[in-house]
């Protein structure tokens, strides 16, 4: 009995580790049947928060063990692998992820829509003149726009190939958090407390302050440097970190 208890204890510890890593469950330790999804961890099925938009759904693990040669020693490796396993993010090729390259507005739409498990909006007259049905990203842009995740750079243009900055990523991520049922509002003092620990907090644009503070105070963004550099371009690795943090907070992993 003691040996069995010890063995189950080790399995439980392993399951907790896999849950933290964003991986699926290890074993079912109970004899009782349980309806579980492939995104479950340690006997727990990810179902999202009670107040989430009904269209937001967890992603099952589709590609277990997916990784890339250029992230082996990268600090964002486990987040990238967890999202890649769910089909949320792809590499630049089968072997390379290119973690330090920038993210376009179209790429953000694709990753965010997949992360939230949103059904793609069908072909229709585009809101933006620079997004056509022939573009691979068109359904993702339409869907992200329909759910309020993104806006155009003008009433007519979306600028799909434009890069996004760290503060722009914060705004879009906070909008996604709202869809997930999270309260993204902060008091003025809450915003100040979250931002003022960084030396360049005054450089955060007014429109992005609440969103940036929300992402920081909830651990969605884990910035370990003294400066926020909010105008710096968001990297693919940083976006993976942010999406993983959001999904974990929203009980979607």
Task: Annotate the PLM regions.
Residues 12, 16-19, 218, 246-249:
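Hydrophobic alpha-helical segments
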């Amino acid at each position: 009995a003691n040996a069995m208890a010890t063995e189950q204890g080790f399995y439980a510890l392993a399951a907790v580790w896999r849950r933290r890593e964003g991986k699926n469950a290890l074993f079912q330790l109970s004899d009782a049947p349980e309806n579980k999804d492939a995104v479950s961890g340690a006997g727990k099925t990810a179902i999202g928060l009670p107040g989430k938009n009904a269209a937001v759904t967890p992603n099952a693990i589709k590609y277990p063990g997916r990784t890339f040669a250029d992230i082996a020693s990268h600090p964002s490796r486990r987040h990238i692998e967890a999202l890649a396993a769910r089909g949320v993010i792809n590499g630049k090729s089968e072997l390379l992820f290119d973690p330090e390259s920038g993210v376009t507005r179209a790429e953000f739409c694709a990753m965010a829509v997949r992360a939230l498990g949103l059904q793609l909006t069908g072909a229709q007259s585009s809101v933006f003149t620079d997004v056509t049905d022939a573009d691979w990203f068109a359904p993702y842009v339409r869907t992200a726009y329909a759910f309020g995740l993104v806006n155009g750079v003008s009433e007519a243009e979306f600028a799909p190939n434009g890069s996004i900055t760290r503060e722009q990523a914060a705004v879009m991520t906070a909008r996604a958090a709202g869809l997930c049922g999270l309260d993204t509002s902060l008091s003025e003092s809450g915003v100040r407390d979250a931002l003022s620990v960084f030396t360049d907090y005054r450089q955060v644009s007014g429109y992005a302050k609440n969103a940036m503070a929300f992402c920081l105070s909830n651990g969605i963004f884990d910035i370990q440097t003294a400066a926020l550099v909010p105008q710096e371009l968001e990297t693919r690795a940083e976006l993976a970190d942010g999406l993983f943090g959001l999904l974990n907070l929203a009980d979607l992993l």
